[in-house]
Amino acid sequence: MANDQDPNKSLINDALTRSMSEFYDDDDDNDSDMCRANDEGEDVFDLPLKVGVSQSRNFSEVNDVLDPLSSLHGPSKKVRFEQQKQQQQHQQLHNDFNTDFNLKSPSSKKMGVEQLIQSANEINDYLANNIDKVNSFNSELLSGSGKLPGRVKSDTATQGTGRLDSMSNFALSDTELDNDDDNYLLDPLANASSTTPTVEHHGYSLLDKALSTSDKEKIYTNKVNSNSQIDTDNHSHESGNTTNNETDENESSEILDYTKFDSFPYPPSSAPNGEPPDLKVLSIECEQENEKELRRISLLLDHYESIPKIPELSDDEALSKFRENIELILQLSKKINDNANTLAISSEDPQKFVNFVMKNPPSLSFRDFIDRIQNKCMFGAVVYLGATYLLQLVFLTRDEMDGPIKLKAKLQEDQAHRIIISTIRIATKLLEDFVHSQNYICKVFGISKRLLTKLEISFMASVNFDGLMITCEKLEKTLHILDDTRQALGNT
C-alpha cells in the first residue's frame, strides 16, 4: 500500500513543479535583476529580510498549518541572505555586549588588598568604640515596653481615637488678643511713618501685657518731649489724638539711641510725666533683682547634693511626676489663707502671672489636657523632667538653706493650663532635638500662635532668664524637691 502511494505522490510533485516553472517563465525577463541562478542552477531571490532569534516563534500557528502544504509544492525556493551584513551586525552586537559587561562588571570596582584590609580595620575600630551604644540601642528596641526611644516621635497620634484624641481645639480662650497686627510689632522703630512716636506706633501692646511694671522698667527706657501729650487711658482706640496739634514739628519727640544702653526703651505710658528714670538707678535695681532671684534658686537647689546624671525614668513615670507636682502646688496654694507659713517671705508679685489667667473656663481639666498633649506629641521623659524643673523654679523656694519647701507664688486653677503650655514648650525647645512646628503645637494646645509667643515670653521673664540653664544635676534634683514638697504639704 505504501508502494502504491509513493509513485502517485511523486507524480503529483512533478506536475506541480512543471506548472510552477511555466508560471514563472513569463516573468524571468522582468525579474532578471531580482532572480539569478546559483552554481546548482536553482533560482535565488535577494530579499531584504533580517533574521532574529525570536523569528521562529512568530506566527507559530500559521507555520504549523503551512508546513504540510509546503510538501505539495515541491522543493521550496532557496533565499540567499546578505551574510556579510549579518556578520557585521552580529559583530557590532557582540562588541556592545562586551562594552556593557565591562562597565557593569563588579571586578572593575574591586578594591586592592591593602585598601580592603585598611577599611576592615576602620570598621573594627568603630565597632569597638561604639559597641556599648549599639547594645543599648538594641536593648531599648527589644524592651518589653514596645516603645521606641522618646526622640523618635511623630506629628500624628498613633494611639486610639478616644474623646481626648478626636478634639483638635478647645476653649483655651485668647479673646483678649487684638486682631490688629500693628499692635504686636516688637520693634519700637518699625513704623517710621509717624514723626511723633505714640504708644501704639511703638508696638508695645504685646509686651505691655506680657510683662509686669517692674519687668518693663528693667527692659525699657525712652525719652519723650514734654510737649507731647499721650492719652494713657485710651491709647488703644484714640492713639491718633495723643499728641498736641499745637506742638511745633521741629520740636517732635526725641528718641534716644537705646542701642548704647543695656536696656531697651520702656513705654512712655509707664514713665511719670514722660520723664525717663535715671539709668544708674535702674541698673542698680536690676542687679539687685537678679541677685535676689539667684538667691531663691540657690536656696531651692543647693540643699541637695549635685549628681551629674539624668534620672532613669520612663515617659509615663516622668509624666506622672509632672502631673503630681502641679497638683501639690495647687494644694499648697489653697492652704495659704489657712496657713501663712506656706508662702515664702520673698514671694513674687502676683501681677507677674496675670497673663496665665484664662478668661473662660476650659473644656478639659488640666489632667486630661496633659494626657492630650502626650497622645498627640509623644514627648520623651526628659521633656517632662525639664517642665517639672521650670515649674518648681517659678513656684517653689525656701526661706533658709535647710528650711522646708514654701511657695514663691500662688498657683490658681485658672492658670494651670497656660503654665503647662509654657513649661512644656520651653522645655522642648531647650532639651529636645525634635521640635514640633508652631502650627501643629498650637492646634494641640488649642491656642493661637500669638498667645503661645506671649506665654513663652511671660514665663521666661518670670524666671528672670537665669533658670533657663538646665543641667543634668538640676534635673536630678527635681525628684528630691518633689519629695520635700510632699512633706511640706503633709506638715501643713
Swiss-Prot record:
MF terms from GO for this chain are: cyclin-dependent protein serine/threonine kinase regulator activity; protein kinase binding
Compositional bias (Polar residues) spans? 8-20
- Phosphoserine: modified positions: S32
Protein's cellular compartments? Cytoplasm; Nucleus
Q: Cite the residue spans of the region called Disordered.
A: 1-32, 143-163, 223-252
Protein keywords: Carbohydrate metabolism, Cyclin, Cytoplasm, Glycogen metabolism, Nucleus, Phosphoprotein
List this protein's GO terms for biological process. Answer: glycogen metabolic process; negative regulation of glycogen biosynthetic process; regulation of glycogen biosynthetic process
Q: Which GO terms describe its cellular component?
A: cyclin-dependent protein kinase holoenzyme complex; cytoplasm; nucleus
Annotated Acidic residues bias: 23-32
Question: Oligomeric state and partners?
Answer: Forms a cyclin-CDK complex with PHO85.
Additional detail: Present with 396 molecules/cell in log phase SD medium.
The entry assigns this protein to a family as follows: Belongs to the cyclin family. PHO80 subfamily.
- Explain the purpose of this protein: Cyclin partner of the cyclin-dependent kinase (CDK) PHO85. Together with cyclin PCL10, negatively controls glycogen accumulation under favorable growth conditions. Involved in phosphorylation and negative regulation of glycogen synthase GSY2. Also has minor GLC8 kinase activity.
Q: What name does the UniProt record give this protein?
A: PHO85 cyclin-8
Q: Which organism is it from?
A: Saccharomyces cerevisiae (strain ATCC 204508 / S288c)
